[in-house]
Amino acid sequence: KEVSTAPKIAIIGAGPAGLYAALRAIEAGLKPIVFERGKDVRERRRDLAKINKEQLVNPESNYCFGEGGAGTYSDGKLYTRSKKRGNVLKGLEWLVHFGADEDILVDAHPHIGTNKLPKVISAMREAIIAAGGEVHFNAKLTDLHIENKVLKGIEINKQKQYAFDEVVLATGHSARDIFYLLHNKGVKIEAKPFALGVRAEHQQEVINYIQYHGETNNPYLPPAAYSLVEQVDGMGVYSFCMCPGGIIAPCATQQEEVVTNGWSPSKRNNPYANSGIVVSVEPKDLPNYTPDDPFVSLNFQKEVERACWIAGGKTQQVPAQ
């Protein structure tokens, strides 16, 4: 559809949720205007290089923020264990339309690959613009204009004002400032359970040997994966985001914190495998828990990430490897 003159809707964030929201808006006959705090895929790579080479984190452009969000450099695994997912075929078909392999439509555990995702993400953006939508980079939401509990508009970069009746917040996991903004505007938010843990790395040959009962380099078998679930002291411990033939990467959004993520290229041909090993954490189990503090989980998360930064010598290196 051509929507350049259609009613407008603001979408905050150009990650997976924001890009899909923009495409759905176009289907519904609305003009999406996407505001992304980070940079486009090409410009974003320079900031990623600074993290890897100089250990310098740009808080607005990093492995989490920028075109495609964390998804652009996060493997492209499309499998979820959630039972609330509904019919995901439409989303998979869109990804194929924009450049992903058709195999993802039939694979049990579909996977695109970090090396292929940037082109897919860029193609999605180009399609949004071609249909009459807009995508703005280096455009951070800094305020919401609310009158009598009714949204009237938004502020970008503490400078530009835009009138909108409807805004989609597709800001993702790491945009903590959005939660504080909502709280300050009187929007009810509350702490929720989350998962916390470490990322374990193994030689891929070892995982192959275990999972394939002695096979390590059979050319007819893909690099092996695993799934781990256990109860420890009444708490669920489980593997998450298992990456065969992958790498571990730094995903902090602030200089003084350490966060890790993992992903694989499309061929999953790196010599190491990795997986998050996490525990389910309830807000009531946290040391400073009070029922009226909506930020108790966020504050605990920040404390852990800063403690890892200190333990790692105040660099972006992990404390132990």
Predicted segments, located by residue:
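Residues forming the flavin
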Residues: K1-W94, F98-Q321
